[in-house]
């Protein structure tokens, strides 16, 4: 049940993000989101380790600190830059369908970078998912492809799966030494430290607070409390209970919830190209996920917004 709710929360981040950047600049929204999340995550980390009578793990040496910083740079700073800036230009529906390509891109980069096995069934799933993303980005129009008149938000959103794939790959080495909750807390902390000066350069660090309406604040709190804190905690609890491969199957619910919530809350319509592309993406990712993961316990890369 927690995993289903986690996918619901992550699907909701596309709606919350779209609403929030409609009221305040992207870097401000991201900085506020992770400032709130960092405080809550570190409070949770301190409480859990104190309850067990243990000290909170601290990176030892330059390599481990660099590893933690790289998680904040890729999974928090870069991801949220392209995610929220992309949502300023494109629909929450398109965003949720494009980001759903994430697991397949992670598998490809893992094969190239970490020399992990990439099975033929994964290659088939990759082709289907790529085709689906292409249909969504081009709106099913050959004319768009020929003229290269793509929506800039869709192109930016393509960077989100790449940033998250890098985060997942870099995180494998970090997770070998640190508990997932601790690694996530460090990533959020470093990401916040990067986002705050970016928001200041954006000129929104102080003015952004006054731009948010009640609904804007609700959106930011959804991103921080549900999409980040509850989402990550419950995700890793699900991985520990079911194993990485079984938990990964639930990820396919994220775009479905994203599209549904975009329609219900933002009144976004789903056209034929989005429906066809979305089916191809979800089906392709599903094939690749089921065919490419061994049924083992351990940490798995999540898909978030």
Region roles according to the model:
Residues 8-9, 13-14, 42-99, 135, ...:
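Specific transmembrane alpha-helical segments of multi-pass solute transporters/efflux pumps
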Residues 23-78, 103-105, 162-170, 184-204, ...:
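Transmembrane alpha-helices of multi-pass small-molecule transport proteins
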Residues 1-31, 43, 146-173, 193-197, ...:
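Glycine-/small-residue-enriched transmembrane alpha-helix faces in small-molecule transporters
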Residues 64-68, 118-131, 178-187:
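Cytoplasmic-side transmembrane-helix entry/capping segments in multi-pass membrane proteins
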Residues 41, 109, 118-140, 252, ...:
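Hydrophobic transmembrane alpha-helices of multi-pass small-molecule transport proteins
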Residues 56, 292-305:
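Intrinsic disorder in cytosolic terminal tails and internal cytosolic loops
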Residues 23-27, 31, 59-65, 138-161, ...:
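Juxtamembrane helix-entry segments on the extracytoplasmic side of multipass membrane proteins
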Residues 30-32, 76, 80, 94-101, ...:
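Helix-helix packing/entry segments at the starts of transmembrane helices
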């Amino acid at each position: 049940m927690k995993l289903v709710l986690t996918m619901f929360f992550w699907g909701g981040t596309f709606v919350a993000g779209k609403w929030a950047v409609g009221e305040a600049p992207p870097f401000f929204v991201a900085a506020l989101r992770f400032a709130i999340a960092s405080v809550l995550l570190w409070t949770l980390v301190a409480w859990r380790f104190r309850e067990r009578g243990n000290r909170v793990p601290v990176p030892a040496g330059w390599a481990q600190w660099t590893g933690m910083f790289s998680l904040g740079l890729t999974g928090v700073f870069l991801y949220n830059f392209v995610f929220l800036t992309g949502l300023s230009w494109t629909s929450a529906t398109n965003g949720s369908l494009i980001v759903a390509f994430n697991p397949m891109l992670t598998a490809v980069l893992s094969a190239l970078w970490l020399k992990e096995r990439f099975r033929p069934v994964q290659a088939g799933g990759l082709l289907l998912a790529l085709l689906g993303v292409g249909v969504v980005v081009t709106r099913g129009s050959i004319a768009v492809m020929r003229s290269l008149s793509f929506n800039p938000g869709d192109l930016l959103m393509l960077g989100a799966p790449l940033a998250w794939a890098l985060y997942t790959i870099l995180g494998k080495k970090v997770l070998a030494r640190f508990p997932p909750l601790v690694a996530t807390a460090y990533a959020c902390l470093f990401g916040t430290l990067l986002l705050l000066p970016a928001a200041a350069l954006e000129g929104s660090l102080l003015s952004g607070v006054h731009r948010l309406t009640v609904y804007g604040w609700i959106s930011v709190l959804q991103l921080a409390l549900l999409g980040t804190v509850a989402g990550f905690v419950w995700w890793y609890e699900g991985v520990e209970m079911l194993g990485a491969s079984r938990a990964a199957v639930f990820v396919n619910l994220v775009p479905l919830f994203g599209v549904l919530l975009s329609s219900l809350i933002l009144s976004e319509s789903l056209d034929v190209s989005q429906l066809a592309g979305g089916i191809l993406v979800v089906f392709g990712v599903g094939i690749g996920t089921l065919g490419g993961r061994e049924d083992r316990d351990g940490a798995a890369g999540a898909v978030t917004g």
